[in-house]
Amino acid sequence: SKSSTETPPSYNQLNYNENLLRFFNSKPVTAPVELDPPKLESSYVSSAREDARSTLSPVHGFEGSGGSGSSGNFTTGSNVRMSSVTNTSNAGTGTSGGGNSAGGASGGVGAVGVAANAPLVTVTLTESLLN
């Protein structure tokens, strides 16, 4: 038997399924695909924007490639923030980190200690950065 101290279900809990059906039957307005309002722009600008979108997408080829500490410093490119790299935590430093994906970093990068409200800085990969 039920305990007398248990609270009975509320009206909203009893009508949960009906509320869901009513919500989806009302066909709610969802966010548009483009969050920017439509603008008239030249075909050059729109094609350049499409090129930028395709080149700034995350690199999916290196996901989970940091096995046993080797080649564990690959990141996914889109979410790398280069300001305030203070490394205040030692989670995953020096080891592979086991696929720890914090803040867009995959493989063995681990937590780099980037503030959540730091501005997003895009960095173009050049040969001098690799050396």
UniProtKB/Swiss-Prot annotation:
The entry's keywords: Biological rhythms, Cytoplasm, Nucleus, Phosphoprotein, Repeat
Name recorded for this polypeptide: Period circadian protein
Chain's gene name: per
Region feature Disordered, mapped onto this chain: 29-109
Keyword Transmembrane assigned: no
Purpose: Essential for biological clock functions. Determines the period length of circadian and ultradian rhythms; an increase in PER dosage leads to shortened circadian rhythms and a decrease leads to lengthened circadian rhythms. Essential for the circadian rhythmicity of locomotor activity, eclosion behavior, and for the rhythmic component of the male courtship song that originates in the thoracic nervous system. The biological cycle depends on the rhythmic formation and nuclear localization of the TIM-PER complex. Light induces the degradation of TIM, which promotes elimination of PER.
Compositionally biased intervals (Low complexity): 71-93
Subcellular location: Nucleus; Cytoplasm, Perinuclear region
Gene Ontology CC: nucleus; perinuclear region of cytoplasm
A GO biological process held by the record: rhythmic process
Quaternary state and interactors: Forms a heterodimer with timeless (TIM); the complex then translocates into the nucleus.
